[in-house]
């Protein structure tokens, strides 16, 4: 599991794209020239940006070679760069930095967010969506299984919180619009939940395990999911998925 798997990620393309659509709807920009899509993945969010601003110069950034290859194939009119978000430097100030479900993987948000604001043009916008599910059973159980089986903690850190992000971005010279939404995704089975998180949040926990260790981990994880996520009357499972949204406009 050394690289991301675009096909697995896109298995839930509609569910993963919906937050990007709703984030983009709140971006208060019309005619813009330079856009960066940070953590563009296979290009599903980049396609939304290209549709809204077809004349803009859009650059997608991702550290995964497989994701970049998929995005280039899907969107030949956009530029894609394989790079670490923390180190990438645009050649010009950006009118929009769009980061859908990517910045939660990076540490030091107290430094990262002001840095991203510094890359914006005057009145430029930083638009961010991050999964806020560190305390949800899906992620709590990952940590519990790892503890039970004596595996190292590979999970990401929790988000800083609404008040912290507001202060960080206000102090960086931005007007801040921030909100939190919980989606309830209808899942046909507990295995479907595993398929969902295997493409994202579960990857760090599995990537250094042997095949037999992975199977042992997933078997126990499946058992614990069954305890935490009961079936609805129609046999479906409702997967609660909180997400944090931020639209920060530079005023300085």
From Swiss-Prot:
Family, per entry: Belongs to the methyltransferase superfamily. Tam family.
Q: Quote the gene name from the UniProt entry.
A: tam
InterPro entries this protein is in? Methyltransf_25 (IPR041698), SAM-dependent_MTases_sf (IPR029063), Trans-aconitate_MeTrfase (IPR023506), Trans_acon_MeTrfase_C (IPR023149)
| EC primary class | transferase
Reactions it catalyzes: trans-aconitate + S-adenosyl-L-methionine = (E)-3-(methoxycarbonyl)pent-2-enedioate + S-adenosyl-L-homocysteine
What the entry lists under Gene3D superfamilies is as follows: S-adenosyl-L-methionine-dependent methyltransferases (1.10.150.290), Vaccinia Virus protein VP39 (3.40.50.150)
Q: Name one GO molecular function term.
A: trans-aconitate 2-methyltransferase activity
Predominant cellular place of this UniProt entry's protein: cytoplasm
The answer to whether the entry has keyword Cytoplasm is: yes
SUPFAM superfamilies attached here?
Answer: S-adenosyl-L-methionine-dependent methyltransferases (SSF53335)
- The organism is Escherichia fergusonii (strain ATCC 35469 / DSM 13698 / CCUG 18766 / IAM 14443 / JCM 21226 / LMG 7866 / NBRC 102419 / NCTC 12128 / CDC 0568-73)
Q: What is the lineage of its organism?
A: Bacteria, Pseudomonadati, Pseudomonadota, Gammaproteobacteria, Enterobacterales
Tell me the protein's name. Trans-aconitate 2-methyltransferase
Q: What is its EC number?
A: 2.1.1.144
* PANTHER family documented for this protein: TRANS-ACONITATE 2-METHYLTRANSFERASE (PTHR43861:SF1), TRANS-ACONITATE 2-METHYLTRANSFERASE-RELATED (PTHR43861)
- Asked if the record carries the keyword Chaperone, the reply is no
Q: Per its UniProt record, what NCBIfam families does this chain match?
A: PRK01683.1 (NF002463)
* Cellular component GO terms, alphabetical: cytoplasm
Q: Where in the cell is it found?
A: Cytoplasm
The protein's matches in Pfam families, at most eight in alphabetical order, are given as: Methyltransf_25 (PF13649)
Function of the protein = Catalyzes the S-adenosylmethionine monomethyl esterification of trans-aconitate.
């Amino acid at each position: 599991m050394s690289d991301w798997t675009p096909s697995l990620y896109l298995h839930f393309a509609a569910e993963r794209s919906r937050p990007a659509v709703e984030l983009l709807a709140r971006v208060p920009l019309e005619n813009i020239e330079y856009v960066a899509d940070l953590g563009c993945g296979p290009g599903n969010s980049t396609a939304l940006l290209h549709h809204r601003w077809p004349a803009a110069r859009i650059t997608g950034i991702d550290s995964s070679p497989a994701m970049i290859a998929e995005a280039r194939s899907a969107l030949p009119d956009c530029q894609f760069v394989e790079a670490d978000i923390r180190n990438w430097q645009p050649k010009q100030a950006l009118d929009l930095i769009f980061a859908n479900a990517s910045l939660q993987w990076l540490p030091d948000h107290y430094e990262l967010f002001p840095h991203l604001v510094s890359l914006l043009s005057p009145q430029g916008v930083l638009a961010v969506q991050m999964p806020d599910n560190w305390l949800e059973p899906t992620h709590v159980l990952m940590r519990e299984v790892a503890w039970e089986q004596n595996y190292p903690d590979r999970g990401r850190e929790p988000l800083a919180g609404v008040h912290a992000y507001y202060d960080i971005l206000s102090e960086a010279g931005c007007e801040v619009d921030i909100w939190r939404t919980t989606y309830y995704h209808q899942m046909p089975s507990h295995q479907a939940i595993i398929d969902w998180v295997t493409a994202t949040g579960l990857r760090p926990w599995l990537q250094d395990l042997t095949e037999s260790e992975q199977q042992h981990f997933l078997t126990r994880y499946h058992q614990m999911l069954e305890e935490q996520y009961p079936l609805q009357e129609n046999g479906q499972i409702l997967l609660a998925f909180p997400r944090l949204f931020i639209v920060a406009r530079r005023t300085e």
